[in-house]
Amino acid sequence: MDEKTKKAEEMALSLARAVAGGDEQAAIKYATWLAEQRVPLRVQVKPEVSPTQDIRLCVSVEDAYMHTVTIWLTVRPDMTVASLKDMVFLDYGFPPSLQQWVVGQRLARDQETLHSHGIRRNGDGAYLYLLSARNTSLNPQELQRQRQLRMLEDLGFKDLTLQSRGPLEPVLPKPRTNQEPGQPDAAPESPPVGWQCPGCTFINKPTRPGCEMCCRARPETYQIPASYQPDEEERARLAGEEEALRQYQQRKQQQQEGNYLQHVQLEQRSLVLNTEPTECPVCYSVLAPGEAVVLRECLHTFCRECLQGTIRNSQEAEVACPFIDSTYSCPGKLLEREIRALLSPEDYQRFLDLGVSIAENRSTLSYHCKTPDCRGWCFFEDDVNEFTCPVCTRVNCLLCKAIHEHMNCREYQDDLALRAQNDVAARQTTEMLKVMLQQGEAMHCPQCRIVVQKKDGCDWIRCTVCHTEICWVTKGPRWGPGGPGDTSGGCRCRVNGIPCHPSCQNCH
């Protein structure tokens, strides 16, 4: 489009605005110019020249990287494109010089209205393309000046220049008085102090951590000038940021102290109770807050009765969590203080006695007092030959594994051999056990060497003395030295899907 055609369109639009506004002198002026230029026009009366009701405009926004998003703007059909650019700038921070609007499949100019492009009802669409700002230098003063010029154009003042009061005569430049020949007129304007946003190129103040327009972070390589002095606005902002940081640190400290006190109070309790309604996975009872116990190690929740029954029926010193389903068996253990809080004093003492008995039976260096019904026992070493029971005070011989007071070891063993020849019942029992061992109906425990027998069922048995799990078909321990689940030793049944023996009947 050449300059003459562009000027004619601007004069035609100015004529339309002057007629719509009732400005006769301006209308005569614009009509006279158009007539002198012999510009062909088409005049059409519109029933609604300047509608003022608000409508919803659907805008598709695209940037230089082909990123697209749809937004909705509340506008009026009589708004100019310049006013629309200002609205987007105020709402989203994109300067007007970076906005390129396409309405009705053609580029829209600033002085044109939305109504002239067919934007008249809700749902009408427009397209906004955001230009790259890398080659543009923007600052607050320039943005404010451009906005004021667009507001003046909307009011009908175009190409406005300020004239001084007085006669319209050219003012001659003042002669130089105290200036040497060759001296420059004025120092060049210093560049604005601050950092340029890499996204929208807005010049921000040095102390600002993010762009005031698009909130992009300040470049890491930027250094605040050492001689820079913040103005009053910056000092107020910095003081506000310091106060907000101080309040944040104070609230964080208070929250940490509160959490610490809460953990201390919780740690001082023997049992952790539930805070929400739950269901016991064992008996399926619905439990209100405070009625169930949450295990500390695995966080599973049960009623007190089910946990008490689990502890009483446990054959191990460490009580396992009773949670189990079709795919998972919890390996967690109940803590000692949880067990003590759940049981009565009598039941807790029995539980401790069970643990002591298990520890005694599983040790190869333990010895139990031979006095009938005496509970005394000890761990012995190789250089110790006698054990004085602290319960019955009898002296046990660790070499003979018996009590033979007033006799030495040789005298006791000779007497024992003599009595064995005359004891028919003892001899018959010994012969029967030998036959059972030879025929495979019994075996020695691989841990404590007592004779154990399988009555029926699968090939898994447990020693009644040391509680060692035994594989009957291999005549050895079921698990490795690590206990249940350790397949580094034992019979290693079902490892890689292979049974431990061709005759295995499931030693689980």
UniProtKB/Swiss-Prot annotation:
Entry's EC annotation: 2.3.2.31
Residue positions of the active site: C458
Entry protein name: RanBP-type and C3HC4-type zinc finger-containing protein 1
SMART domains assigned: RING (SM00184), ZnF_RBZ (SM00547)
Location of the region described as Interaction with TAB2 in the Swiss-Prot/TrEMBL record: 1-268
Chain segments carrying region Interaction with RNF31: 69-131
Binding site for Zn(2+) 3: C369, C374, C389, C392
GO CC, any one term: LUBAC complex
One GO MF term: zinc ion binding
Function as written in the Swiss-Prot or TrEMBL entry: E3 ubiquitin-protein ligase, which accepts ubiquitin from specific E2 ubiquitin-conjugating enzymes, such as UBE2L3/UBCM4, and then transfers it to substrates. Functions as an E3 ligase for oxidized IREB2 and both heme and oxygen are necessary for IREB2 ubiquitination. Promotes ubiquitination of TAB2 and IRF3 and their degradation by the proteasome. Component of the LUBAC complex which conjugates linear ('Met-1'-linked) polyubiquitin chains to substrates and plays a key role in NF-kappa-B activation and regulation of inflammation.
Assembly mode: Component of the LUBAC complex (linear ubiquitin chain assembly complex) which consists of SHARPIN, RBCK1 and RNF31. LUBAC has a MW of approximately 600 kDa suggesting a heteromultimeric assembly of its subunits. Interacts with beta-I-type (PRKCB1) and zeta-type protein kinase C (PRKCZ). Interacts with UBE2L3. Interacts with IREB2 only in iron-rich conditions. Associates with the TNF-R1 signaling complex (TNF-RSC) in a stimulation-dependent manner. Interacts with EYA1, TAB2, TAB3, MAP3K7 TRAF6 and RIPK1. Interacts with IRF3.
Description of the deletion phenotype: Impaired TNF-alpha-mediated NF-kappa-B activation and enhanced JNK-mediated apoptosis.
InterPro entries: BRcat_RBR_HOIL1, HOIL1_RBR_mRING-HC-C3HC3D, LUBAC_E3_Ligases, Rcat_RBR_HOIL1, TRIAD_supradom, Ubiquitin-like_dom, Ubiquitin-like_domsf, Znf-RING_euk
Renumbered zinc finger spans (IBR-type): 349-409
